[in-house]
Curated annotation (Swiss-Prot):
Compositionally biased residues, Polar residues: 182-194, 265-286, 354-367
Organism: Meyerozyma guilliermondii (strain ATCC 6260 / CBS 566 / DSM 6381 / JCM 1539 / NBRC 10279 / NRRL Y-324) (Yeast)
Keyword vocabulary terms for this entry: Cytoplasm
Family: Belongs to the TDA11 family.
Name the record gives this protein: Topoisomerase I damage affected protein 11
Length: 391
């Protein structure tokens, strides 16, 4: 058996590509074997068929490429190829033979215009029309690739969203199942007599709770810190309310003392004199007299305010008045905190019911105490009366 390409087959293919007319004519070879017009590929002949004289010599390489291009064109069946057919090889051996156009490399991926360019030397040997066609095809391939990338990106984003939603659903279902299993197991817990087993079980339950809380979605636990924040703020304000109230009270007391210093006083001295050590101690009688002086009638205050002495008051005098009022306030606080001396003196004196005399505790403790020195109240009164008459 001899595998040879049929010359009539090549002529029929070239005739069908060059003209859009009907099928090629069917003739018989010299050997008597009919050449079928619908057959493709190689013809299997038992005997070697002679080549006709009229047909030009065609190489095997051109035959294989033309049969491959013809089959690919029939598979695609695109309208662009029928309207604008690409240049094909001519049958005449004497005419110029143009190179074939490259086929799409990624046709299986849905890319119709992604062609592989030939070498630079081959492109330079082509005409300007062919070069422009290559350029247009390459631009269309780039646009097609960009569209494909945008479609793939949209598909990727959609897949990521679906994956995130599916994860949330799975986490919720797992949380429900774990919580249901935990409640069921807690109802039917075995009461073991060994405390070690109980401790191990409690630690396992704690670890399960921690894993569930960490695996759960963070969106569920967002409102929890919002609820805890008001509690912490309320505790903070409750702790600060006491010192703030104390400061406010002290401020109000200072303000009252400052207002008292602005009210005209009874003393006629324009320049305040420095206070002695005796005056620094404020007794209840002095504080009462000071309050009585403050509560003066309106006529007296108006007359005092209209006096030129008050009008010509210096800032230094005001400062001294304010300082004196503050010192008086400090003395009042000290008096309220310390016990009065009169009560201590009263506690030291004792009253004798037998003779009606008062005896001091210090004198009783003294060793030189004599009972004759004590006098009764009637004798003391009579002696005082006699002294008054003599005078």
């Amino acid at each position: 058996m001899d595998l040879t390409p049929s010359p009539r087959k090549h002529r029929s293919v070239s005739h069908s590509q060059s003209s859009d007319s009907g099928p090629p004519s069917s003739t018989k070879s010299n050997s008597g074997v009919p050449a079928g017009s619908n057959r493709k590929g190689f013809n299997i002949n038992i005997a070697v068929s002679p080549i006709s004289v009229s047909s030009p010599p065609v190489s095997h390489k051109h035959t294989l490429t033309r049969s491959h291009s013809h089959s690919s064109k029939h598979r695609r069946g695109s309208s662009a190829s029928t309207n604008n057919p690409l240049p094909q090889l001519l049958e005449d051996a004497d005419g110029p033979q143009l190179p074939e156009w490259p086929q799409p490399a990624n046709e299986s991926q849905g890319l119709r215009y992604n062609l592989e360019l030939p070498s630079d030397e081959h492109l330079a040997s082509l005409d300007i029309d062919d070069q422009l066609k290559f350029l247009a095809l390459k631009e269309m391939g780039i646009v097609e690739l960009k569209d494909k990338i945008s479609q793939l990106n949209s598909i990727l984003h959609k897949g990521e969203k679906d994956l995130h939603r599916l994860r949330e659903l799975v986490q919720r279902s797992l949380y429900k199942e774990m919580s249901a299993g935990y409640t069921g197991s807690s109802k039917h817990v075995r009461q073991s007599s060994n405390p070690r087993d109980e401790a191990i079980a409690s630690t396992k339950n704690r670890t399960r709770r921690r894993t569930l809380s960490s695996s759960s979605s963070p969106s569920k636990y967002l409102p929890v810190p919002e609820q805890s924040e008001p509690d912490s703020k309320s505790r903070l304000w409750s702790n600060l309310s006491k010192p703030l109230g104390f400061i406010q009270q002290f401020d109000s007391m200072l303000q009252n003392e400052f207002e008292r210093s602005l009210i005209p006083q009874v003393s006629n001295s324009a320049n305040p004199q420095p206070r002695t050590s005796e005056e620094s101690y404020q007794s209840p009688l002095r504080s009462r007299s000071k309050n009585n002086d403050v509560d003066l009638p309106t006529e007296w205050t108006s007359s005092r305010s209209s006096s030129p002495q008050r009008a010509s008051r210096n800032p230094e005098e005001m400062f001294q008045a304010v300082s004196s009022s503050i010192w008086s306030f400090v003395n009042d606080v000290r008096e309220n905190m310390l016990p009065p001396r009169e009560e201590e003196e009263k506690d030291k004196e004792l009253y004798n019911l037998d003779n009606g005399s008062t005896v001091s505790v210090e004198n009783m403790n003294n060793s030189d105490y004599d009972e004759t020195t004590t006098e009764t109240l009637p004798r003391r009164r009579s002696r005082q009366n006699s002294n008054a008459i003599d005078k």
